[in-house]
Amino acid sequence: MFYVKVMPALQKACEELQNQWSAKSGKWPVPETPLVAVETRRSERWPHPYLGLLPGVAAYSSTLEDYCHLYNPYIDALTRCDLGQTHRRVATQPVLSDQLCQQLKKLFSCPRNTSVKAKLEFEAAVRTHQALDNSQVFLELKTFVLNLSAFLNKRYSDRSSHIELFQKQLIMHTFFFLVSIKAPELCEKFCNIFKLYFNIDTMDQATLDIFKQKASVFLIPRRHGKTWIVVAIISILLASVQDLRIGYVAHQKHVANAVFTEVINTLHTFFPGKYMDVKKENGTIIFGLPNKKPSTLLCATCFNKNSIRGQTFQLLFVDEANFIKKDALPTILGFMLQKDAKIIFISSSNSSDQSTSFLYNLKGASERMLNVVSYVCSNHKEDFSMQDGLISCPCYSLHVPSYISIDEQIKTTTNLFLDGVFDTELMGDSSCGTLSTFQIISESALSQFELCRIDTASPQVQAHLNSTVHMYIDPAFTNNLDASGTGISVIGRLGAKTKVILGCEHFFLQKLTGTAALQIASCATSLLRSVVIIHPMIKCAQITIEGNSSQDSAVAIANFIDECAPIPVTFYHQSDKTKGVLCPLYLLGQEKAVAFESFIYAMNLGLCKASQLIVSHTIKLSFDPVTYLLEQVRAIKCQSLRDGSHTYHAKQKNLSDDLLVSVVMSLYLSSANTLPFKPLHIERFF
């Protein structure tokens, strides 16, 4: 019975002794006089609070810095905090031999005469260091790190023996911004100290500044512990840092309610309920320790954006930000104007839908806000899509969290329910059609194409110019200038392999009057007539009219051109699969990818040239037709499809690729000798 009565007192006394031992163990005592005193000019020496006055160059000594961190660490192995012990792993400290210790003591056995100025300078350094160590802000920030460390060390969950790298990065983005607003004058000193706590002491200042930015974005695959770590961070912030205002916004009400409840349960586990004021009607938690200003958490959803208006959050966590209601984004982004506020966007990435993967557009931004967890690098995305048994990038050392199951069977089973869902939910930044990120045509080839043009009017060149040219027409039957236009190009053969662009048009209908076929045919005929006038050796033209948009209009265009052409013309004829009837049109299919590859090959080898006398009636006189074409050539992108095939296009926001398609297809079809080019059959059937 006596043992039972005194047990609580014994435990309390034991904890006090452990705290005292923890506070003193491994710490150097501050000497009354400097151990070392270099009597040089004040500008050439450096006062160290534990060693004395050292040469100024010692401030840049990494050896001295490592020595001090090893033998006088800021945090020892069994540091106590409100939530238990941190269990920090401490490096083994080398021990000096007895003989060496005796010799070193002899060096300092002689009395040293230290000047009064040196003593005053040393004492000032000691006071500054002690004031920094005991400042309220430093103790709060230190308490947060220690409490979070103890909390995540199997106090939060049995599985939380360690955290993932992205979770540590999320903690650092939160913490170092907090340092920058809580102690702006001492921010650099505090950051240098706390870098040791996170084991990033070798990180340079430019990289560390990224953590202090006012916005950060995390794209993490599903089921990896995003909300889990956010709840831990918010809970420990409320318990450790006073006068802090935190906001949490979720895409659904049940998610916000779950986080709200989990934070309450976490705080109740370690602290009495009297420290906490919960207001369920507006999702607010107010937590305050005795004699400290309370901190506040507000949990809201994107559907109730008015609840976050007028708030002064210093940290705003936006969970599943890709799926946030777009009407709420302006309200959320309004906190960027607040000087001491940071927005942290956290989301999984359903990259099969552009509307729910808009945050990935931040990739490549100079602010370096985007953080992505992916199992496949950009160079191997196509391999990942084409090989069913591949679950991660071959150039990665696969690290899978202990609570995640990823293998070939999981991938196969998941894709059975919905094709491609494993890729889009796991890879984070992939899409159902992946665009190549490298330049397809070299810059030197583009410069050569623009500058080195052929004088096709000279007799020497005309002697080698083939008498037959090829024209390709990609018609568009719309007056929407932003959507699409008609692309027309004329290409001639120079010698055995070289192709020369003699003329090109990018024609847009001004009005829809029912005469689109006639207007397109007139544009093509005018182009052909001008090319023939400049190059009188051209005697025949092979014409291909694309009929994917309207087969009837394509046939009409062929009839108009046949009646008005200045030279004999033949047309590509497509066979009707059911009746076998030949029609003067061309249906563009999967050969488009092959045609683009042929064009890319010709451009990179310099086998595709432009004429100095290139003809164009529709491209503005102030705009060089070759430069106009090059804008589309530079925008060529290779898109990988799910079936393993790929296609090419050069569509841009303010410019269509009609002219480029006509040039590509004209070059491709002019290279074949067995295509069905025939005169137009004009015999009447009635």
Swiss-Prot record:
Q: Which GO terms describe its cellular component?
A: host cell nucleus
Single Gene Ontology BP term? chromosome organization
Subunit details for this protein? Answer: Interacts with the terminase subunits TRM1 and TRM2. Interacts with portal protein.
Q: Tell me the protein's name.
A: Tripartite terminase subunit 3
| Motif Walker B motif mapped to chain | 315-320
User: Could you tell me where this protein is found in the cell?
Assistant: Host nucleus
Q: Where is this motif: Walker A motif?
A: 220-227
Q: In the Enzyme Commission scheme, what number(s) does this protein have?
A: 3.1.-.-
UniProt-recorded Gene Ontology molecular function terms = DNA binding; hydrolase activity
Q: Which organism is it from?
A: Alcelaphine herpesvirus 1 (strain C500)
One Pfam family named in its UniProt record: DNA_pack_C
Catalytic positions are E320 (for atpase activity), D474 (for nuclease activity), E546 (for nuclease activity), D658 (for nuclease activity)
Q: What does this protein do?
A: Component of the molecular motor that translocates viral genomic DNA in empty capsid during DNA packaging. Forms a tripartite terminase complex together with TRM1 and TRM2 in the host cytoplasm. Once the complex reaches the host nucleus, it interacts with the capsid portal vertex. This portal forms a ring in which genomic DNA is translocated into the capsid. TRM3 carries an RNase H-like nuclease activity that plays an important role for the cleavage of concatemeric viral DNA into unit length genomes.
Where it mainly occurs, coarsely classed, is host cell
InterPro entries annotated for this entry? DNA_pack_C (IPR003498), DNA_pack_C_sf (IPR038435), DNA_pack_N (IPR003499), HSV_TRM3 (IPR033663), P-loop_NTPase (IPR027417)
Q: Which UniProt keywords apply?
A: DNA-binding, Host nucleus, Hydrolase, Viral genome packaging, Viral release from host cell
The family this protein is said to belong to: Belongs to the herpesviridae TRM3 protein family.
